[in-house]
Amino acid sequence: MNKDQSKIPQATAKRLPLYYRFLKNLHASGKQRVSSAELSDAVKVDSATIRRDFSYFGALGKKGYGYNVDYLLSFFRKTLDQDEMTDVILIGVGNLGTAFLHYNFTKNNNTKISMAFDINESKIGTEVGGVPVYNLDDLEQHVKDESVAILTVPAVAAQSITDRLVALGIKGILNFTPARLNVPEHIRIHHIDLAVELQSLVYFLKHYSVLEEIE
């Protein structure tokens, strides 16, 4: 994303990969153009929001015609740096970490886990999903140019490991632990607590109907 585009709202930026994934599917099916209404129905984002999101990037479509799928796909590929590979490291090869290694973002052409770390001796020196697993004690020896890390470790260990990652130059952390991490302001962390998300879903099912939320 270029310097000017980095000024777009964070909520818009988070939706761009969603648009890109749908456009890839449209392109694969041979569809040549799409309306904001069709996009809205597919990605479950209202049409007005989609048009506003796209407006931050200039004129991407034509009134009465919609959007050219090939053009949008090419535009968002460049915007999201899809032609540039990003190597990601993973800390914690437990059940969740192992699942990530086997999946390894196979649908994303520009992102892959290149190495993993753990303290379990039975896993150190092995490969999981084709990804080498190293001793966490040797973290500083292996991490060089990587800037993104996935954290799937016990909460009690999360902060100390995060401190080491920051010292190594990691700029972004996808945190799957319950811990809320303290980092410098220039570090970006996305917290994903699966237990909290599940509890929230159950609560909303019990206390709110979908129609109430729409209203």
From Swiss-Prot:
Keywords, ordered alphabetically: Cytoplasm, DNA-binding, NAD, Repressor, Transcription, Transcription regulation
Localization of this protein: Cytoplasm
Biological process terms in GO annotation: negative regulation of DNA-templated transcription; response to redox state
GO molecular function: DNA binding; DNA-binding transcription factor activity
Residues in the DNA-binding region annotation: 18-57
Cellular compartments per GO CC: cytoplasm
SUPFAM superfamilies: NAD(P)-binding Rossmann-fold domains (SSF51735), Winged helix' DNA-binding domain (SSF46785)
Residues at which NAD(+) binds: G92, V93, G94, N95, L96, G97
Assembly notes: Homodimer.
Assigned protein family: Belongs to the transcriptional regulatory Rex family.
UniProt function note: Modulates transcription in response to changes in cellular NADH/NAD(+) redox state.
Protein's name according to its UniProt entry: Redox-sensing transcriptional repressor Rex
Originating gene: rex
